[in-house]
Amino acid sequence: MTENPLAADLDHVLAHTAPLWEDLRGRRLFITGGTGFFGCWLLESFAWANDRLGLNAEAVVLTRDPAAFAAKHPGLSAHPAIAFHQGDVRSFAFPQGQFSHVIHGATEASAALNRDNPLAMIDTITEGTRRTLDFARQCGASRFLLTSSGAVYGTQPPDLTHTQEDYLGAPDCTLAGSAYGEGKRLAELFCTVYGEKYRLEVTVARGFAFVGPSLPLNSHFAIGNFLRDALAGDPIEIGGDGTPFRSYLYAADLAVWLWTILLRGRPGRVYNVGAEEAVSIEGVARSVAARFSPAPPVRVARVAVPGQPAARYVPSTARARTELGLEAWIGLDEALRRTIDWNQRRHD
């Protein structure tokens, strides 16, 4: 039997979540967005825990195209504890039977959709969230996790080093590009209303920036683009001036955080999900380059404007640390090493 290339990461997830899985023993979960980056890590860690702990649990995954998912993730597709339910998140027919937990992981960030069809972005987020909440009511679910985004805070002020959950910023509604952030804000409000009106125990995970196996390399994620360039032996291209700050949570830690927030988060509570160690975009690019020999050159498209404060997109994770005991256990250097190794092994 071929060893799972994510075995070390999945053991890491299990080590930090072992007591939680008893809540899912013999239960059924329903997951939307299961084919995206968050979703594949949720499913990988679910299947791993299910096998090792003998949970006899089942995850039913909503997808528009089961065949495409099977082609991309054949191991998950064939796993006996994972089933697929075909449909669009905005209008899917409700699967039969009872479900104890629902994870609404659609819709992930898509710069292309947000730019080219912001109305579709808003509709997918808002209609999909209401449809999934209605299903949670109908199927008897007791817990509901929404994966939201740090985009709900709008632009982070440059003098605010880390954004806390009670920061009341917002996207700029005069910009069509705010569709994603505003859609997620409304999705969170739907969750609040359903939680209060129907006594559904809802928790919200506001994601920031991530790195790890299965992160798209050709999307709008800068770190993914840098990895793509370096893996191809090309110069690493930075489209801007390289000064904005980000922080990166590794995918295995992300899975720990999501399961913990679903199963132990306080109902009605929002939790930032990310790392606090800020690094500039140029710093990220140079860290990626340093992982290769010879190191590819790093090209910065624009010169920074003197005296202009650097943009930031960095969360405070104090709430998750103090209430749930969560940490960013795997630092950026090790995260890059594991991500590069996984991508190289895929193409060997």
Residue ranges and their predicted role:
Residues 1-101:
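N-terminal Rossmann/SDR dinucleotide-binding element
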Residues 5, 83, 164, 209, ...:
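C-terminal substrate-binding subdomain of Rossmann-fold SDR/epimerase-dehydratase oxidoreductases
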Residues 86-124:
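NAD(P)H-binding glycine-rich loop region in Rossmannoid oxidoreductase-like domains
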Residues 108-112, 150-157, 177, 208-214:
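Active-site segment of SDR-like NAD(P)-dependent oxidoreductases
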Residues 130-177:
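Conserved Rossmann-fold NAD(P)-dependent oxidoreductase catalytic core, especially the SDR/UDP-sugar
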Residues 149, 188-213, 224:
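Conserved beta-loop-beta element that borders a ligand/cofactor-binding pocket
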